Amino acid sequence: MEEVCEGKEFSFPRQEEDVLSFWTEIDAFKTQLKRTENLPEYIFYDGPPFATGLPHYGHILAGTIKDIVTRYQTMTGHHVTRRFGWDCHGLPVENEIDRKLNIKRRDEVIKMGIDKYNEECRSIVTRYVAEWEKVITRCGRWIDFKNDYKTMDLPFMESVWWVFSQLWEKNLVYRGFKVMPYSTGCKTPLSNFEAGQNYKEVPDPEIMVTFPVIGDQDNAAFVAWTTTPWTLPSNLALCVNAKFVYVKVRNKNTGKVYIVAESRLSALPTDKPKAKLSNGPAGDTKKANPKAKGAKPESAADSYEVLEKFNGASLVGKKYEPLFDYFSDFSSEAFRVVADDYVTDDSGTGIVHCAPAFGEDDYRVCLLNKIIKKGENLVVAVDDDGLFTERITHFSGRYVKDADKDIIEAVKAKGRLVKTGSFTHSYPFCWRSDTPLIYRAVPSWFVRVEQLKEKLLKSNEQTEWVPGYVKDKRFHNWLENARDWAISRSRFWGTPLPIWISDDGEEVVIMDSVEKLEKLSGVKVFDLHRHHIDHITIPSSRGDEFGVLRRVEDVFDCWFESGSMPYAYIHYPFENKELFEKNFPGDFVAEGLDQTRGWFYTLMVLSTALFEKPAFKNLICNGLVLAEDGKKMAKKLRNYPPPLEVIDEYGADAVRLYLINSPVVRAEPLRFKKEGVLGVVKDVFLPWYNAYRFLVQNAKRLETEGGVPFVPTDLATIQSANILDQWIHSATQSLVRFVREEMDAYRLYTVVPRLLKFLDNLTNIYVRFNRKRLKGRTGEDDCHTALSTLFNVLLTSCKVMAPFTPFFTETLYQNLRKACKGSEESVHYCSIPPREGMEGERIELSVTRMMKIIDLARNIRERNKLPLKTPLKEMIVVHPDADFLNDITGVLREYVLEELNVRSLVPCNDTLKYASLKAEPDFSVLGKRLGKSMGLVAKEVKEMSQKDILAFEEAGEVTIANHLLKETDIKIVRVFKRPDDLKENEIDSAGDGDVLVILDLRADDSLVEAGFAREIVNRIQKLRKKSGLEPTDFVEVYFQSLDEDESVSKQVLVSQEQNIKDSIGSTLLLSSLMPSHAVIIADETFTPKETSDESVKKVPKLSYKISLARPALKFNEEAVLALYSGDVKSATGLQTYLLSRDHSNLKSEFQAGDGKITVSCIENVPVATVVLGEHLHLSVGDDLLSKRNA
């Protein structure tokens, strides 16, 4: 393995760029696909985005989820084809061209020419493809852009034709009028899910108008309420509820007689009318989600006299005088009262005015009552631009919303205005043009979705969603209330409907392929867009006298195209028939929550209609990524950092991990914070990198000391008696099992936290607690075992983490693989490791318990301002379970003592010796179960005696107030009892309700000395770091007392010599032993500071100097002189020569010569054999040890 730099010098973004270059060099993605082509297929459908805008964090999130799953499936033995796709048709593209060419009206497109318009559309479809590829590739996602699919390509469009033809054959398609949300800005109807994407709070007028009853003896008039005055010119009926009671009332002041629902009499104006009205009309469907903010009307009891009461059913059939005469030709069928249950009495007047061309319920009710006929005499008096047609003579050419005020004035002039006002409510706007939507009847082609409802619900049950509640609630409810789907659009740039109709409408031919069109028309077809096929006619099969069939003008809703993607992207059924039929439904899809009403829905509808099965088996639904302020991310608001800017600063892996380790993978919203990405770097990647670097450093040290390359022992054959080796091996197996189980269930939200917890345990438990072993302080064999364990765990974690953080794992893997024979060229060619060996649940539990004890003890230290360098005398662990105490006081005892800097650990299973017990009922568990009994049970639980609680802990259950309570129902809290002979500042405790940890805070002389020794060690380590030394760099450390009385420091150094040596890896030398030729690397002087910290006050106030020096040769002067029979000049020449040599080379020569070297290169000095240990030592420390041993 190669040396690696310090974490602070390591650039995550730069190493990712290097990895990208490496992947390009080895053609990694293509190679992976080639290597897996004979493995079972895993079918992934990638929803096509529009390329008319740049990718944002929502795209990156969904792309990351897709990349993780497909990488994982590849690494678990599948061939995963990943083709990117583009949604090329529809409003987004046309809007861009309309803005570019300043096109406002449909007829401007016709005048320009559909051919020119469509080619303009085609020219911008792939405008941002390069940018998309750049961002997606930089994010680490592997997907095929070269073999992408486009919804505008002929093979794709041909398959869409085939899908439609199958629906036609199943009698699932019909033509009719449907009142739909309509965008006057884009001149097209919108689907219901499109209409719900852009609501705004806006003011609108609201009025009450009269419709005089023909032939009524009291000259009564029906009163209707509406928020859409512009629909009044198209009124054809009034609707009541047959079950309601209606009243005929006379205004006591004006004498006017009105008919309204009895329960809505209060809505009529009083003598002092209010400016604001009620919250909304009774069942008025021409408004959109009204939420009026009007004042509550006064009582009308004093202003009106009730003349008559009658049931709504009795009003049915009564004729009334229309407001306007624009529809006088409908008089025989229209201008009468009908009844329907959609009329409510929670607002309005209980009477709804019906304009069937502009209200969904209006249309249904008028059709049901034969005021209009299906597909025939419906007159839509508003054109595609939202302007009144010539039929509405007084307002012809006016935009409907702009005409509201004048229409109100016209009603007032006719004496028909009862009341007027305004209110603010939530109203839908076009998600593309940002213009207010209207509801308008449009001729359209429909898929009979309502007819498929039961099959859709059945298909939904065959799928697995993450999170599940989105499927069971949101999507299920949407399917349950599904309406027929208008699949046609009166637009230009899209896949044309393959419907050819004769002039008399009697003959209809559906094209299911290009071949059929060419055969019937005799025209060669190379493109299916409108300007290439609109002119194509086919002869009538009835004979020449019936003329020809022409294509209808409409194109498909682009959602129909994307819903056809599973078939069209592989040109089914014209190609890949076996591939599709063998692997349908697909295995996996993933998009945002908004697609429950979009792509997920259209996929489900079409696959159920075609095959009576879902299009996919598994689905991950992510939430919305919002700006930090909680608002939707928007370029114009500049409320989010550009994705590439964040990636260039912190790396794509950090962005990926930040996104997928958040609520957004549970379909909840995420407020994106750049600081959160930085947090991932600091909390995950830097510790992970440092653990890896620590391995490399110590493996290189072992190589240097042993003279042979480091070859790790295989994980399966490591035989280690070390408890932490066994633990991390077991934890790794548990991790592999958990990741496989949860990833197979697509639960990323459980996998990622577990992965990060494992990395945290690896760095903060295994590496931290094993530093001495890993540094070789416990012997070469034990060091090799520890390093092999760390190596194998890091290698396994690289493979398991590879789908999540593809860059960093590749970087680590490329260096780690240098120590492995026969390793794969890339980590992404590897398999997710299988479980190797048994998991040690007992060992994992033991270490978990150890960490619980350590965390509680750290809390006590922090609370008492006692840093870890301050040694403590004793820790007591109180727990009733002997196994728990054995875990802590057995093989893990030394780790606990060393980590907490405590001298002794005392187990105690007598829970009442140091604590009193309290029982607390778990209300969250018991509340629902016990209901009204909860109060009594809670009272008795809290009153349980110490004896009762101990008995409950032993038995695991207790009966209270005739209810059997288990361990999970009651929380036992241990409250610390301080011994009477100790003061409050001499002892403290911490507990978690299960275990109690007690620390003796008193100091004694031995502890003070140990504390001073720990301080010295800490100073040395900081000086090493400050000097830029690597952990593998060997230096000698010298101590010099600066106090007049050096006896105190010497006493400490003697008593703590072994502890210091264990910590720094060498003997701490007195400065008096430093040779004159020693090379000092760094030194620093330390003097005690005044402090109020009681723990520090007890440490002796000593001044001293620490020096770090390169290892210096220590000569035995007498033995060197004897080599030359007392010739001082020759002896001095030898010493000078040896001091000039590189220390490490000299050491190697002695090792090679079995402790001897022959020196023959000194001019005028005889040849001499120098013996290590006899004539010199390679360091002062070696010399000192030799003298002591002698």
UniProtKB/Swiss-Prot annotation:
Species, as recorded: Arabidopsis thaliana
PROSITE patterns linked to this entry: AA_TRNA_LIGASE_I
Listed GO MF terms: aminoacyl-tRNA deacylase activity; ATP binding; isoleucine-tRNA ligase activity; tRNA binding
Enzyme class: ligase
A matching Pfam family: DUF5915
Annotated keywords: Aminoacyl-tRNA synthetase, ATP-binding, Cytoplasm, Ligase, Nucleotide-binding, Protein biosynthesis
Any one of the GO CC terms: cytosol
NCBIfam families per record: ileS
Subcellular localization: Cytoplasm, Cytosol
Reaction catalyzed: tRNA(Ile) + L-isoleucine + ATP = L-isoleucyl-tRNA(Ile) + AMP + diphosphate
Primary location: cytoplasm
Motif position, 'KMSKS' region: 632-636
Gene3D superfamilies reported for this sequence: HUPs, Isoleucyl-tRNA Synthetase, Domain 1
Protein residues bound to ATP: 635
Protein name: Isoleucine--tRNA ligase, cytoplasmic
InterPro entries: aa-tRNA-synth_I_CS, aa-tRNA-synth_Ia, Anticodon_Ile_ABEc, Ile-tRNA-ligase, Ile-tRNA-ligase_type2, M/V/L/I-tRNA-synth_anticd-bd, Rossmann-like_a/b/a_fold, tRNAsynth_Ia_anticodon-bd
Biological processes, Gene Ontology terms: isoleucyl-tRNA aminoacylation; post-embryonic development; reproductive structure development
Family classification: Belongs to the class-I aminoacyl-tRNA synthetase family.
The protein's Enzyme Commission number: 6.1.1.5
Region of interest: Disordered: 271-299
Record motif 'HIGH' region, residues: 49-59
